[in-house]
Protein backbone atom coordinates (compact mmCIF):
# COMPACT_ATOMS: atom_id res chain seq x y z
CA UNK A 1 0.00 0.00 0.00
CA UNK A 2 1.09 3.55 -0.72
CA UNK A 3 0.29 6.35 1.72
CA UNK A 4 0.47 9.94 0.45
CA UNK A 5 0.05 12.86 2.86
CA UNK A 6 -0.67 16.39 1.67
CA UNK A 7 0.44 19.16 4.02
CA UNK A 8 0.59 22.94 3.83
CA UNK A 9 -0.70 26.24 5.12
CA UNK A 10 -4.47 26.70 5.22
CA UNK A 11 -5.91 27.82 1.90
CA UNK A 12 -3.09 26.69 -0.40
CA UNK A 13 -5.21 23.99 -2.08
CA UNK A 14 -4.32 20.78 -0.19
CA UNK A 15 -7.83 19.38 -0.29
CA UNK A 16 -8.35 20.00 -4.00
CA UNK A 17 -4.97 18.48 -4.87
CA UNK A 18 -5.65 15.48 -2.59
CA UNK A 19 -8.99 14.97 -4.36
CA UNK A 20 -7.45 15.31 -7.84
CA UNK A 21 -4.67 12.86 -6.96
CA UNK A 22 -7.14 10.30 -5.65
CA UNK A 23 -9.43 10.63 -8.67
CA UNK A 24 -6.55 10.25 -11.13
CA UNK A 25 -5.35 7.09 -9.38
CA UNK A 26 -8.86 5.62 -9.41
CA UNK A 27 -8.95 6.17 -13.18
CA UNK A 28 -5.71 4.20 -13.42
CA UNK A 29 -7.44 1.23 -11.77
CA UNK A 30 -6.07 1.71 -8.24
CA UNK A 31 -8.30 1.17 -5.22
CA UNK A 32 -8.07 4.50 -3.39
CA UNK A 33 -9.44 6.11 -0.25
CA UNK A 34 -8.96 9.84 0.37
CA UNK A 35 -9.34 10.80 4.03
CA UNK A 36 -9.73 14.38 5.25
CA UNK A 37 -8.30 15.09 8.71
CA UNK A 38 -8.90 18.84 8.41
CA UNK A 39 -11.59 20.01 10.89
CA UNK A 40 -12.89 22.42 8.21
CA UNK A 41 -13.88 19.63 5.81
CA UNK A 42 -14.25 20.49 2.13
CA UNK A 43 -13.24 17.17 0.53
CA UNK A 44 -16.83 16.22 -0.33
CA UNK A 45 -17.31 19.71 -1.80
CA UNK A 46 -14.47 19.02 -4.24
CA UNK A 47 -16.39 16.00 -5.54
CA UNK A 48 -19.69 17.92 -5.44
CA UNK A 49 -21.24 15.35 -3.09
CA UNK A 50 -24.84 16.31 -2.13
CA UNK A 51 -25.26 17.57 1.45
CA UNK A 52 -27.80 14.86 2.28
CA UNK A 53 -25.36 12.11 1.31
CA UNK A 54 -22.66 13.68 3.49
CA UNK A 55 -24.98 13.79 6.50
CA UNK A 56 -25.97 10.15 6.03
CA UNK A 57 -22.31 9.09 5.96
CA UNK A 58 -21.70 10.35 9.54
CA UNK A 59 -17.94 10.32 9.06
CA UNK A 60 -17.84 6.96 7.25
CA UNK A 61 -16.52 6.48 3.66
CA UNK A 62 -18.55 7.74 0.69
CA UNK A 63 -18.21 5.89 -2.62
CA UNK A 64 -17.37 8.15 -5.60
CA UNK A 65 -16.78 5.45 -8.20
CA UNK A 66 -15.87 1.77 -8.35
CA UNK A 67 -12.29 2.44 -7.23
CA UNK A 68 -12.57 5.59 -5.13
CA UNK A 69 -13.91 6.35 -1.65
CA UNK A 70 -13.64 9.55 0.34
CA UNK A 71 -14.00 10.05 4.08
CA UNK A 72 -14.42 13.18 6.19
CA UNK A 73 -13.64 12.08 9.73
CA UNK A 74 -16.05 13.34 12.40
CA UNK A 75 -13.47 13.95 15.12
CA UNK A 76 -16.00 14.48 17.94
CA UNK A 77 -17.70 11.16 17.20
CA UNK A 78 -14.39 9.31 16.76
CA UNK A 79 -12.95 10.62 20.02
CA UNK A 80 -16.03 9.54 21.97
CA UNK A 81 -15.86 6.13 20.26
CA UNK A 82 -12.13 5.42 20.63
CA UNK A 83 -11.10 7.33 23.75
CA UNK A 84 -14.13 6.13 25.76
CA UNK A 85 -13.26 6.25 29.45
CA UNK A 86 -10.41 8.73 28.92
CA UNK A 87 -12.74 11.27 27.32
CA UNK A 88 -15.42 10.79 29.98
CA UNK A 89 -12.91 11.20 32.83
CA UNK A 90 -11.52 14.47 31.42
CA UNK A 91 -15.06 15.74 30.83
CA UNK A 92 -15.98 14.88 34.45
CA UNK A 93 -12.80 16.55 35.73
CA UNK A 94 -13.61 19.82 33.95
CA UNK A 95 -17.24 19.64 35.06
CA UNK A 96 -16.13 19.21 38.71
CA UNK A 97 -14.17 22.48 38.50
CA UNK A 98 -17.45 24.32 37.95
CA UNK A 99 -17.38 24.63 34.18
CA UNK A 100 -20.67 24.52 32.34
CA UNK A 101 -21.48 21.01 31.06
CA UNK A 102 -21.31 22.05 27.39
CA UNK A 103 -17.98 23.85 27.88
CA UNK A 104 -16.58 20.85 29.80
CA UNK A 105 -17.60 18.63 26.88
CA UNK A 106 -15.76 20.87 24.41
CA UNK A 107 -12.60 21.20 26.54
CA UNK A 108 -12.41 17.44 27.10
CA UNK A 109 -10.82 17.18 23.64
CA UNK A 110 -7.19 17.74 24.66
CA UNK A 111 -4.38 18.71 22.24
CA UNK A 112 -3.17 15.62 20.42
CA UNK A 113 -6.40 13.61 20.77
CA UNK A 114 -7.51 14.49 17.24
CA UNK A 115 -4.17 13.60 15.68
CA UNK A 116 -3.87 10.29 17.54
CA UNK A 117 -7.45 9.37 16.63
CA UNK A 118 -6.66 10.09 12.98
CA UNK A 119 -3.60 7.84 13.18
CA UNK A 120 -5.90 4.94 14.01
CA UNK A 121 -7.26 5.17 10.49
CA UNK A 122 -3.77 5.04 8.98
CA UNK A 123 -3.08 1.83 10.92
CA UNK A 124 -6.54 0.42 10.24
CA UNK A 125 -6.53 0.92 6.46
CA UNK A 126 -2.91 -0.20 6.14
CA UNK A 127 -3.51 -3.42 8.12
CA UNK A 128 -6.77 -4.24 6.34
CA UNK A 129 -5.12 -3.98 2.91
CA UNK A 130 -8.37 -3.27 1.04
CA UNK A 131 -6.90 -0.27 -0.79
CA UNK A 132 -3.85 0.28 -2.99
CA UNK A 133 -3.44 3.92 -1.96
CA UNK A 134 -4.41 5.91 1.14
CA UNK A 135 -4.36 9.69 0.65
CA UNK A 136 -4.51 11.94 3.71
CA UNK A 137 -5.58 15.56 3.45
CA UNK A 138 -3.85 16.88 6.58
CA UNK A 139 -4.89 19.90 8.67
CA UNK A 140 -2.83 23.13 8.31
CA UNK A 141 0.93 22.83 8.86
CA UNK A 142 1.15 23.07 12.68
CA UNK A 143 -1.33 20.24 13.17
CA UNK A 144 0.35 18.24 10.38
CA UNK A 145 3.65 18.39 12.26
CA UNK A 146 1.91 17.29 15.45
CA UNK A 147 0.26 14.47 13.49
CA UNK A 148 3.60 12.93 12.42
CA UNK A 149 5.14 13.45 15.87
CA UNK A 150 2.31 11.85 17.88
CA UNK A 151 3.36 8.17 17.50
CA UNK A 152 6.74 9.01 19.05
CA UNK A 153 5.15 11.02 21.87
CA UNK A 154 2.60 8.28 22.62
CA UNK A 155 5.29 5.58 22.62
CA UNK A 156 7.43 7.64 25.04
CA UNK A 157 4.47 8.20 27.40
CA UNK A 158 3.51 4.51 27.45
CA UNK A 159 7.09 3.39 28.11
CA UNK A 160 8.18 6.07 30.61
CA UNK A 161 5.09 7.40 32.40
CA UNK A 162 2.08 5.12 31.98
CA UNK A 163 3.02 2.23 34.31
CA UNK A 164 4.19 4.55 37.10
CA UNK A 165 1.09 6.72 36.84
CA UNK A 166 -1.17 3.66 36.91
CA UNK A 167 0.58 2.28 40.00
CA UNK A 168 0.43 5.61 41.86
CA UNK A 169 -3.29 5.94 41.16
CA UNK A 170 -3.93 2.37 42.30
CA UNK A 171 -2.26 3.10 45.65
CA UNK A 172 -3.63 6.64 46.07
CA UNK A 173 -7.24 6.08 44.96
CA UNK A 174 -8.57 4.43 48.18
CA UNK A 175 -7.17 7.13 50.52
CA UNK A 176 -6.99 10.32 48.43
CA UNK A 177 -10.43 9.59 46.94
CA UNK A 178 -11.99 10.00 50.42
CA UNK A 179 -10.24 13.34 51.04
CA UNK A 180 -11.25 15.21 47.88
CA UNK A 181 -14.19 15.50 45.51
CA UNK A 182 -11.82 15.87 42.54
CA UNK A 183 -12.21 12.69 40.45
CA UNK A 184 -9.20 10.41 40.05
CA UNK A 185 -8.70 8.22 36.97
CA UNK A 186 -9.95 4.69 37.63
CA UNK A 187 -8.67 1.40 36.24
CA UNK A 188 -11.04 1.63 33.26
CA UNK A 189 -9.30 4.87 32.25
CA UNK A 190 -5.91 3.14 32.14
CA UNK A 191 -7.31 0.09 30.35
CA UNK A 192 -8.77 2.40 27.69
CA UNK A 193 -5.38 4.07 27.19
CA UNK A 194 -3.67 0.69 26.96
CA UNK A 195 -6.17 -0.61 24.39
CA UNK A 196 -5.82 2.58 22.40
CA UNK A 197 -2.04 2.28 22.32
CA UNK A 198 -2.29 -1.34 21.14
CA UNK A 199 -4.37 -0.17 18.17
CA UNK A 200 -1.68 2.38 17.30
CA UNK A 201 1.30 0.01 17.46
CA UNK A 202 3.42 0.01 14.35
CA UNK A 203 2.04 3.22 12.85
CA UNK A 204 5.34 5.05 13.47
CA UNK A 205 7.21 2.48 11.33
CA UNK A 206 4.62 2.96 8.57
CA UNK A 207 5.03 6.75 8.56
CA UNK A 208 8.83 6.70 8.35
CA UNK A 209 9.06 3.97 5.69
CA UNK A 210 9.85 5.86 2.43
CA UNK A 211 8.68 2.89 0.35
CA UNK A 212 5.22 3.28 1.87
CA UNK A 213 4.72 6.88 2.98
CA UNK A 214 5.44 10.21 1.31
CA UNK A 215 4.53 13.74 2.30
CA UNK A 216 3.84 16.28 -0.43
CA UNK A 217 4.06 19.90 0.67
CA UNK A 218 1.55 22.16 -1.05
CA UNK A 219 2.65 25.78 -1.23
CA UNK A 220 1.83 29.05 -2.99
CA UNK A 221 4.44 31.42 -4.46
CA UNK A 222 4.17 33.88 -1.55
CA UNK A 223 6.64 34.80 1.19
CA UNK A 224 4.61 33.77 4.25
CA UNK A 225 3.50 30.50 2.68
CA UNK A 226 7.07 29.71 1.60
CA UNK A 227 8.41 30.30 5.12
CA UNK A 228 5.83 27.94 6.59
CA UNK A 229 6.62 25.33 3.94
CA UNK A 230 10.31 25.56 4.82
CA UNK A 231 9.60 25.01 8.51
CA UNK A 232 7.35 22.06 7.73
CA UNK A 233 10.05 20.54 5.51
CA UNK A 234 12.58 20.79 8.34
CA UNK A 235 10.31 19.14 10.90
CA UNK A 236 9.25 16.34 8.56
CA UNK A 237 12.94 15.61 7.94
CA UNK A 238 13.67 15.61 11.68
CA UNK A 239 10.88 13.09 12.25
CA UNK A 240 12.21 10.95 9.39
CA UNK A 241 9.18 11.26 7.11
CA UNK A 242 10.01 11.32 3.39
CA UNK A 243 9.04 14.46 1.45
CA UNK A 244 8.88 13.29 -2.16
CA UNK A 245 7.50 16.43 -3.84
CA UNK A 246 6.60 20.08 -3.40
CA UNK A 247 3.56 21.36 -5.29
CA UNK A 248 3.43 25.10 -5.98
CA UNK A 249 -0.22 25.89 -6.55
CA UNK A 250 -1.99 28.92 -8.07
CA UNK A 251 0.85 30.15 -10.29
CA UNK A 252 -0.38 32.89 -12.65
CA UNK A 253 0.10 31.68 -16.27
CA UNK A 254 2.31 33.92 -18.41
CA UNK A 255 -0.05 33.62 -21.39
CA UNK A 256 -2.75 35.41 -19.38
CA UNK A 257 -0.50 38.46 -19.09
CA UNK A 258 0.24 38.40 -22.81
CA UNK A 259 -3.45 38.17 -23.67
CA UNK A 260 -4.78 40.70 -21.17
CA UNK A 261 -1.83 43.13 -21.08
CA UNK A 262 -2.68 43.81 -17.43
CA UNK A 263 0.00 45.61 -15.37
CA UNK A 264 -1.66 44.50 -12.11
CA UNK A 265 -1.35 40.80 -13.00
CA UNK A 266 2.11 41.34 -14.46
CA UNK A 267 3.33 42.73 -11.15
CA UNK A 268 1.95 39.69 -9.33
CA UNK A 269 3.51 37.36 -11.89
CA UNK A 270 6.97 38.89 -11.31
CA UNK A 271 6.55 38.48 -7.54
CA UNK A 272 5.51 34.85 -8.03
CA UNK A 273 8.47 34.15 -10.34
CA UNK A 274 10.83 35.29 -7.60
CA UNK A 275 9.29 32.94 -5.03
CA UNK A 276 9.03 30.00 -7.44
CA UNK A 277 12.77 30.35 -8.04
CA UNK A 278 13.40 30.41 -4.28
CA UNK A 279 11.22 27.33 -3.79
CA UNK A 280 13.09 25.39 -6.48
CA UNK A 281 16.42 26.40 -4.96
CA UNK A 282 15.47 25.72 -1.36
CA UNK A 283 13.84 22.32 -1.79
CA UNK A 284 16.32 20.94 -4.33
CA UNK A 285 16.76 18.03 -5.06
CA UNK A 286 13.10 17.37 -4.13
CA UNK A 287 11.06 17.81 -7.34
CA UNK A 288 8.82 20.88 -7.55
CA UNK A 289 5.56 20.70 -9.51
CA UNK A 290 4.11 24.03 -10.64
CA UNK A 291 0.32 24.23 -11.01
CA UNK A 292 -1.28 27.19 -12.82
CA UNK A 293 -4.05 29.28 -11.32
CA UNK A 294 -7.19 28.09 -13.09
CA UNK A 295 -9.92 30.38 -14.37
CA UNK A 296 -12.64 28.62 -12.36
CA UNK A 297 -12.89 26.79 -9.04
CA UNK A 298 -12.01 23.10 -9.11
CA UNK A 299 -15.26 21.31 -8.25
CA UNK A 300 -16.50 18.09 -9.83
CA UNK A 301 -14.81 15.14 -11.53
CA UNK A 302 -14.08 16.82 -14.85
CA UNK A 303 -12.14 19.70 -13.29
CA UNK A 304 -10.36 17.38 -10.84
CA UNK A 305 -9.21 15.29 -13.79
CA UNK A 306 -7.90 18.42 -15.51
CA UNK A 307 -6.04 19.52 -12.37
CA UNK A 308 -4.43 16.09 -11.92
CA UNK A 309 -3.19 16.20 -15.51
CA UNK A 310 -1.65 19.64 -14.91
CA UNK A 311 0.15 18.38 -11.80
CA UNK A 312 1.38 14.95 -12.83
CA UNK A 313 1.15 14.86 -16.63
CA UNK A 314 1.60 11.21 -17.65
CA UNK A 315 3.32 10.21 -14.39
CA UNK A 316 1.34 7.94 -12.04
CA UNK A 317 0.53 10.04 -8.93
CA UNK A 318 1.48 7.20 -6.57
CA UNK A 319 5.05 7.15 -7.88
CA UNK A 320 7.75 7.88 -5.29
CA UNK A 321 9.20 11.02 -6.86
CA UNK A 322 12.09 11.35 -4.40
CA UNK A 323 13.44 9.18 -1.60
CA UNK A 324 16.78 10.60 -0.48
CA UNK A 325 16.76 12.71 2.70
CA UNK A 326 18.54 15.95 1.65
CA UNK A 327 20.08 16.56 5.07
CA UNK A 328 19.97 15.36 8.66
CA UNK A 329 21.12 16.74 12.00
CA UNK A 330 22.93 14.58 14.54
CA UNK A 331 25.26 14.83 17.53
CA UNK A 332 28.90 13.81 17.22
CA UNK A 333 31.37 14.12 20.11
CA UNK A 334 29.04 16.53 21.88
CA UNK A 335 28.61 18.82 18.88
CA UNK A 336 25.78 19.18 16.40
CA UNK A 337 26.67 18.12 12.88
CA UNK A 338 24.59 18.79 9.78
CA UNK A 339 25.03 16.12 7.10
CA UNK A 340 24.01 17.23 3.61
CA UNK A 341 23.68 14.81 0.71
CA UNK A 342 25.88 16.12 -2.09
CA UNK A 343 26.63 13.40 -4.69
CA UNK A 344 29.58 14.22 -6.92
CA UNK A 345 30.74 17.25 -4.94
CA UNK A 346 34.52 17.58 -4.95
CA UNK A 347 36.77 18.71 -2.13
CA UNK A 348 37.04 22.41 -2.79
CA UNK A 349 36.32 25.59 -0.85
CA UNK A 350 33.00 25.51 0.98
CA UNK A 351 31.06 28.75 1.40
CA UNK A 352 28.71 28.99 4.38
CA UNK A 353 26.35 31.93 4.85
CA UNK A 354 24.29 31.84 8.06
CA UNK A 355 21.02 33.73 8.17
CA UNK A 356 18.58 34.10 11.03
CA UNK A 357 17.09 30.64 10.65
CA UNK A 358 19.06 28.91 7.88
CA UNK A 359 22.50 28.18 6.45
CA UNK A 360 23.17 28.52 2.74
CA UNK A 361 25.92 26.12 1.60
CA UNK A 362 27.84 26.53 -1.66
CA UNK A 363 30.49 24.20 -3.06
CA UNK A 364 31.28 24.89 -6.71
CA UNK A 365 27.98 24.55 -8.58
CA UNK A 366 26.30 22.84 -5.61
CA UNK A 367 23.98 24.93 -3.43
CA UNK A 368 21.78 23.89 -0.51
CA UNK A 369 19.52 25.67 1.99
CA UNK A 370 19.40 24.15 5.46
CA UNK A 371 16.61 25.34 7.76
CA UNK A 372 17.82 25.37 11.38
CA UNK A 373 15.72 24.16 14.32
CA UNK A 374 15.50 26.57 17.27
CA UNK A 375 18.21 24.74 19.23
CA UNK A 376 20.79 25.45 16.51
CA UNK A 377 19.85 29.03 15.60
CA UNK A 378 22.15 30.56 18.21
CA UNK A 379 25.08 28.38 17.14
CA UNK A 380 27.62 29.26 14.45
CA UNK A 381 29.15 27.00 11.79
CA UNK A 382 32.63 26.18 13.12
CA UNK A 383 33.96 24.29 10.11
CA UNK A 384 32.83 22.18 7.16
CA UNK A 385 34.26 19.33 5.14
CA UNK A 386 33.37 17.01 2.27
CA UNK A 387 33.25 13.33 3.21
CA UNK A 388 32.35 10.83 0.48
CA UNK A 389 29.03 12.09 -0.94
CA UNK A 390 28.22 14.33 2.01
CA UNK A 391 29.05 17.80 3.28
CA UNK A 392 29.50 17.90 7.06
CA UNK A 393 28.96 21.20 8.89
CA UNK A 394 30.06 21.35 12.53
CA UNK A 395 28.10 23.78 14.73
CA UNK A 396 29.34 25.32 17.97
Curated annotation (Swiss-Prot):
List the transmembrane segments.
none
Plastid is among the record's keywords = no
Give the record's keywords alphabetically: Arsenical resistance, ATP-binding, Nucleotide-binding, Translocase
Which reaction(s) are listed as its catalytic activity?
arsenite(in) + ATP + H2O = arsenite(out) + ADP + phosphate + H(+)
Query: Pfam families per the record?
Result: ArsA_ATPase, ArsA_HSP20
**Matches recorded under InterPro entries:** Anion-transp_ATPase-like_dom (IPR025723), ArsA_HSP20-like (IPR040612), ATPase_ArsA/GET3 (IPR016300), HSP20-like_chaperone (IPR008978), P-loop_NTPase (IPR027417)
Annotated ATP binding lies at 8-15
According to its UniProt record, the EC number is 7.3.2.7
Q: Which GO terms describe its molecular function?
A: ATP binding; ATP hydrolysis activity; ATPase-coupled arsenite transmembrane transporter activity
Function according to Swiss-Prot or TrEMBL:
Anion-transporting ATPase. Catalyzes the extrusion of arsenite.
Please state which protein family the record places this protein in. Belongs to the arsA ATPase family.
Query: Which named protein is this?
Result: Putative arsenical pump-driving ATPase 1
Gene source species: Aquifex aeolicus (strain VF5)
Task: Name the lineage.
Answer: Bacteria, Pseudomonadati, Aquificota, Aquificia, Aquificales
In the UniProt record, the gene name given for this protein reads: arsA1
Amino acid sequence: MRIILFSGKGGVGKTTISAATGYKLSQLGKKVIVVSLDPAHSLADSFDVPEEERRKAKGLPIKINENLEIQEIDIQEEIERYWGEVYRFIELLFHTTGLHEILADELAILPGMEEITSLLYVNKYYREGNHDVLILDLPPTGESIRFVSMPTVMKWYMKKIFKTERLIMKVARPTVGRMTDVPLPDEEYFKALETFYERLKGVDEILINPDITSIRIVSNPEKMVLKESQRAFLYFLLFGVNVDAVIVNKVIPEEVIQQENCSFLEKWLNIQKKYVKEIESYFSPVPVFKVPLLEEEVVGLERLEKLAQLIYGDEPPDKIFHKEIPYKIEQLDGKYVIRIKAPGVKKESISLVKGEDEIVVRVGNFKAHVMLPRKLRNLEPERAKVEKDEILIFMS
